Amino acid sequence: MSSKRQFFKHTLIFGVGGIVGQLVPLILLPLYTNYLAPTEYGTLDLIALASDIINTVFLIGGIRLAAMTFYKQAESEEARRRIAITISSLLWLAIAIAISLSIFFIDYLDLFLKTGQKEILACGLAITLLEGLVTVPMTLTQARLESLRFVLTNLAMAISRMVLCIYFVAGLEWGIWGVLYAQAMVTIVFGILLTYRELRLGSIYPDTSKWREILLFCLPLVPNGIFAFVVAASGRVSLLHCGPYEGEAAALGAVGLYALASRLVSVTYSMGVTPIQRVWTVEMYDVYKTPDAPHVFGNFLLRLLCVQVFFALLISLFATEIVRTVCDRSYHDAAALIPLFGLYLLLTLFATQMSNTFFITRKTNYNLYCTALMLPFVFLFMDLLVPRWGMMGAVIAYNLAYLPYIGIMYYLTQRLFRVCYPLGKMALLLTITVLCYVLSLLCGSGVELSALSIDEFSALSREEKVMDAWNRIQWLPNIAKMGIMFLWGVLVWFSGILSQEDKALAIRVCKRGLQKLRLLP
């Protein structure tokens, strides 16, 4: 494994880039939630959902995972250059086939997703699938631990997309088409540039004999990806087809609110966990070979959990304030879903980290078994909860279904590679977090509801809506919630959850950051 200094250096760069990069989607959320109706936001979410299953079926997602694994396990620089162009050429073929067949069967996809807009669905799918031209070169950049290049490229793409979205959606008022045009321009331009760079770095000719080995690696991921898609899509599909809503427009609007809550919480995951995971997924193959690997893997999950719990608690405490301040009134009901999505991401974090064992040991078929065993629980809880409770029932159903899934995965991964998880410390961390969240409920909302009717509020200009939201802010509840966040940090610090090494590292990082800002000598 690289030195700890190198590990934290790359993590810091990925982290800063992740935070800055996620600011762009956060800036775009008010744009989407004020210029797009919930039905349009729901349509964008369904396009992303459909592209996920297409990526899985046509191995586009699997090829991205293969890029990291095969590149890191290549034994020479020449082999790494050859594997880069080999994987890229296979990816181009997969994308071409996927786009062609998606457009051919667009009528059936639209019938299932109930968007009522086949042209938007077809264009959206083609544009989203083309993002594979960006993801694989970026995966190879990550594998080389070119963290600064990775972050700057991501940042350039995010800022370009933000500027184009603002111009097309707010300036030209093109609505959902403006979002798609901005995505298409950024994807095509950066896809060409990144692909050209990989061609220069790698071998000119692909090793097609490796295609079979790559496909054999990816194929077990297809049924697992399909099962994972069914799990991920069941909430949206249940809302569309059996939710307690009158009419397709109301159901599609519910999907939009559901997608907004999911998006807000996933931003915290991207800012907190994703930068660390980008380094860890490269380093874990080397750690696996060391004698203290079981303890390193277990302690790493605890640290990762601390980071995600902090961000999940933060956004859960201020969920109502965020949604009421930055979103149009038609999106306000999404705030109630955010704490439940925070819990869902914590469960996802457990499962994701345990599933790394399957990739290290090349037993990806076990991942399939775990996901397949989860499906009956998802269907059962969705059938019981969604018809009665709608969006809230869908998120609760996911959380309930994940509990047996994690139990099954824990049993299988421990048989392949026994990890020493600090379960007691994890339980204490979650207990402290739940108590702090319950305490925050006593504080009330930090932003009052508008006294205006829906028609009066809709008649306001954008500037008047912002001023109305600002005037409704209640400072005392917000200060109390910030105090609860501070209390959470104190309890975690002094409860023994963090080791002395973790505390010393945190102090060094904070001190170095203050010195960089010239706040300390």
Feature-to-residue mapping (PLM):
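Interhelical loop/hinge segments that connect adjacent transmembrane helices in multipass membrane
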Residues: 1-7, 176, 192-232, 279-295, ...
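N-terminal membrane topogenesis motif
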Residues: 1-26, 78-79, 85, 208-224, ...
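Interfacial segments at transmembrane-helix termini and the short loops linking adjacent helices
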Residues: 4, 106-124, 315-352, 392, ...
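Hydrophobic transmembrane helix module of multi-pass membrane transport proteins
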Residues: 20, 52, 89-234
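Helix-loop junctions and terminal segments of transmembrane helices
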Residues: 59-75, 143, 261, 265-305, ...
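Membrane-proximal transmembrane or re-entrant/amphipathic helices at the cytosolic face
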Residues: 444-521
